[in-house]
């Protein structure tokens, strides 16, 4: 019993060359792993052509089994350049204590000792530390993040953001210089809705009103109401304050309430008025009383002298 005769060989048939007839069912089985895009791949595989592949026949089955052995050629690998750090001119300000700006003119850092020693951190020209010199790195890609040199941003008049397949217009913050005493009309009202829906499914953000200028606070605030007193009210308040010693006592609460009802003011107004006028009016009343006492004493002295002299 021959086992080999019972095994059917796997048909690997292809029509390689000029085939004049039509192809039947073509089954392409690609078992090769995909190679990276940065690699150039060359294939070297002999094509197995069967003896009965004449390129003709209606039901001729072409099955390409690409079991390919790859010869990989690596070409696009970038070699990293060695990073070289250099220290250029000295930037130390020798006149910083005097509020000026003066540099020593050293153009490049020159170490004072061998590499790895402490002396290697000191410049032999200007005797300054290495950190005072401008550092320059070679072999390193430089990236600049500047808001003024960004070519990938849309123009500042209209900035759009992607938000779940919708375009959102986002206005830029506006810097407003407001004159003294001028504020926006919407600054005192509540802020409106920040988002409203427009046509086309887009969303627009409304910028809230800017805060008022700090110079306008003193001009737009309401003036504090100042109570004006009549001459009669002033006289009664002065006499009461002199009687209680310019200080309201708790035991005199009934007298205070009676005075407030009589002259038509509130207790707090009377208390504030006594506090504000305590120094000035109390001194004036003391001076007047002293002058009255002195004049009365002088009159007594003159009367005594007149009685003694016949």
From Swiss-Prot:
The keyword Hydrolase does not apply. Its main location: nucleus. PANTHER family: ZINC-FINGER HOMEODOMAIN PROTEIN 2, ZINC-FINGER HOMEODOMAIN PROTEIN 3. This is Zinc-finger homeodomain protein 3. One of its GO terms (cellular component) is nucleus. PROSITE patterns: HOMEOBOX_2, ZF_HD_DIMER. One of its GO terms (biological process) is glucosinolate metabolic process. Residues 39-56, 292-310 have a biased composition (Polar residues). Homo- and heterodimer with other ZFHD proteins. Interacts with MIF2 and MIF3; these interactions prevent nuclear localization and DNA-binding to inhibit transcription regulation activity. Binds to ZHD1, ZHD2 and ZHD11. Interacts with HIPP30. Interacts with KIN10, KIN11 and FLZ8.
């Amino acid at each position: 019993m021959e086992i080999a005769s019972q095994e059917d060989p796997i048909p690997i048939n292809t029509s390689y060359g000029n085939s004049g007839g039509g192809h039947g069912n073509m089954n392409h089985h690609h078992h090769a792993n995909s190679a990276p895009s940065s690699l150039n791949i060359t294939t070297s595989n002999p094509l197995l052509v069967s003896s009965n592949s004449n390129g003709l026949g209606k039901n001729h089955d072409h099955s390409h089994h690409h079991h390919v052995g790859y010869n990989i050629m690596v070409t696009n690998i970038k070699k990293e350049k060695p990073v070289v750090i250099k220290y250029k001119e000295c930037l130390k300000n020798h006149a910083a204590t005097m509020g000026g700006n003066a540099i020593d003119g050293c153009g490049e850092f020159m170490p004072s000792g061998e590499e790895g020693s402490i002396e290697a951190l000191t410049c032999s020209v200007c005797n300054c530390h290495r950190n005072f010199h401008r550092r320059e790195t070679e072999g390193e890609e430089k990236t600049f993040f500047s808001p003024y040199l960004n070519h990938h941003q849309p123009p500042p008049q209209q900035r759009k953001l992607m938000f779940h397949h919708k375009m959102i217009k986002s206005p830029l913050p506006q810097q407003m210089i407001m004159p003294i005493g001028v504020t926006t009309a919407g600054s005192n009202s509540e802020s409106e809705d920040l988002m409203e829906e427009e046509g086309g499914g887009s969303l627009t953000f409304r910028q809230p009103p800017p805060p008022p200028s700090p110079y306008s606070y003193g001009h737009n605030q309401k003036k504090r109401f100042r109570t004006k007193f009549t001459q009669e009210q002033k006289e009664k308040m002065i006499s009461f304050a002199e009687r209680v010693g310019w200080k309201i006592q708790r035991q005199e609460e009934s007298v205070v309430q009676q005075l407030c009802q009589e002259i038509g003011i509130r207790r707090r107004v009377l208390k504030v008025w006594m506090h504000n006028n305590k120094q000035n009016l109390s001194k004036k009343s003391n001076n007047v009383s002293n002058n009255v006492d002195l004049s009365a004493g002088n009159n007594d002295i003159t009367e005594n002298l007149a009685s003694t002299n016949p």
